[in-house]
Amino acid sequence: EKICFEYLKNCNFEKKLENFYKKKTILITGGAGAIGSNLAISLSKLVGKRGKIIVLDNLSAIRDEEPWNLPSLENMIFVKGDIRNDEDLKRVFKERPEIIFHLAAFFANQNSVDYPENSASVDVMGQIKLLEYAALTNVERFVYASSGCAIYGSYPKLPLVEDFISMHLTTPYQINKMTGEMYCNFYNHHYGLKTVNCRFFNSYGPGEVSGQYRNVIPNFLFWSR
């Protein structure tokens, strides 16, 4: 860990990040959630006053009693909408996003077991529609929020190897997330759209809430009170 931080410090990583994102227009789907809102706040600082952050979220996973994670910022636009809806996508793509962070999802495993059709509708068909818009408008980069449990399965062999792919998938969420990675690869090879697949493992942090369909660590913290 110490070596890693020293490397980042010596190579001016923060400055390179700032130079890369400066003045960019960035679309974040699912940007009102815990990960998305923290990402939006961080990127809003990097893009600067001449850049723009567009947050697209249908707020389906937010309960009335939960705090609103997104601040009101001069360079941030919030659009309440659905990635499956053409009118909503046309609205955000009018802003000409250069980079997309696709975090919107029908979250997560148990929810997908209870409602498999809704899960496939959002996590597969919604993503295909978003990828299509990204390819047609020459988006520079499409970053997809995948899942470690989806790719490595419920019972992976240890130690894990990064290029290992499991067929032991036990929930529609796992199946859909793996499918999402494959569609990213397809749009990369077929259309030249630059895509990045990020595999999250039980993420937690500011803005996370507990609940039946939420991540395990926030639930542990809630139950321990």
Model-predicted segments: where are they?
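Alpha-helical substrate-binding/gating segment
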Residues: 189, 203, 218-225
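N-terminal Rossmann-like NAD(P)+-binding domain of SDR-like oxidoreductases, especially those catalyzing
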Residues: 1-203
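Residue-level signature of the cytosolic catalytic core of signaling kinases
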Residues: 93, 168, 209-213, 225
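Glycine/proline-rich active-site loop of Rossmann-fold NAD(P)-dependent oxidoreductases
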Residues: 178, 203-218
